[in-house]
A protein has these predicted regions:
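Transmembrane alpha-helix signature in integral membrane proteins
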Residues: 4-33, 52
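Membrane-interfacial helix termini and adjacent extracytoplasmic/periplasmic loops
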Residues: 60-97, 167-171
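Alpha-helical transmembrane segments of multi-pass membrane proteins
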Residues: 9-17, 51, 131, 135-144, ...
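Interhelical loop and adjacent transmembrane-helix boundary motif
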Residues: 1-6, 167-210
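Transmembrane alpha-helices
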Residues: 20, 105-108, 116, 130-163
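Cytoplasmic-entry segments and transmembrane alpha-helices of multi-pass inner-membrane transporters
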Residues: 32-65, 120, 134
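Membrane-helix interface segments
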Residues: 36-44, 72-73, 88, 130-131, ...
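C-terminal transmembrane helix and the adjacent membrane-cytosol boundary/short C-terminal tail
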Residues: 40, 109-120, 124-125, 137, ...
């Protein structure tokens, strides 16, 4: 069986971009959500969790409308940065970020809420500001939450299908990820090829979960 490694590279590249961007975007959001107590918090949290319950096809359809040259976001990127989002790698990165946002946000928020309150209180009592407290107290003591967010987000992005297909199509070397390669193999009745792609994806995902559990156990022992 001939194995094309390009879809794996596209998937890995996509997972790396999505995970990195979401780590940067979601940490301040998780911090605000964990500290805020306003009536708006449940509404914003529910909105951020929508990708968990929405069908990937439905989510992908609306994202395609937004990211197309006639959509507001797509039109903005095209006119300002001269970047076409629909059926392009930058487009599936944005779509992947939205689809995987709940995985990173939930893990980071849980990690922040699990911190003993006295740690933050002691830091503020010693005259430390919020930024210094975050970098010296919060982040070093919530490594388990950060690791969970990274692994869950990366694994989910690797297996993403509906959103990527709707927004990016299946352009070899650009938007054709492993899950789409599996679908195309099945569609062409090449079950041997589909098994090969799927098996590798299962192994990679399993190793990711195994790594997550091991790192979390090590963190708890400390």
């Amino acid at each position: 069986l001939k194995l094309d490694f390009v879809p794996f590279w596209v998937s890995f590249h996509l997972g790396l971009w999505v995970t990195t961007l979401l780590l940067v975007i979601c940490f301040p959001l998780a911090w605000v959500f964990s500290q805020a107590k306003g009536r708006w918090v449940p509404w914003v949290e529910s909105t951020a969790s929508l990708p968990l319950v929405l069908s990937p096809t439905v989510l992908g359809f609306y994202l395609l409308l937004l990211l197309s040259p006639r959509g507001r976001i797509g039109q903005f990127f095209l006119s300002v940065f001269h970047v076409r989002l629909a059926f392009s790698f930058p487009g599936i990165v944005i779509a992947g970020c939205i689809a995987s946002l709940p995985f990173m946000l939930t893990a980071l928020r849980t990690g922040i809420l699990a911190l003993p309150p006295h740690l933050l209180e002691a830091s503020y009592t010693l005259g430390k500001g919020k930024v210094e407290t975050i970098f010296r107290i919060v982040i070093p003591n919530m490594k388990s939450g950060i690791i969970a967010g990274i692994v869950n987000t990366f694994a989910h992005t690797l297996g993403e299908f509906g959103v990527v297909l709707m927004v990016g199509g299946s352009i070899p070397g650009v938007t054709k990820v492993v899950s789409i390669a599996v679908y195309e193999k099945v569609e062409s009745l090449d079950f041997g090829g589909a098994h090969l792609y799927a098996a590798i994806l299962v192994v990679v995902s399993y190793l990711g979960v195994l790594l997550l559990n091991r790192l979390q156990r090590q963190e708890r022992r400390r």
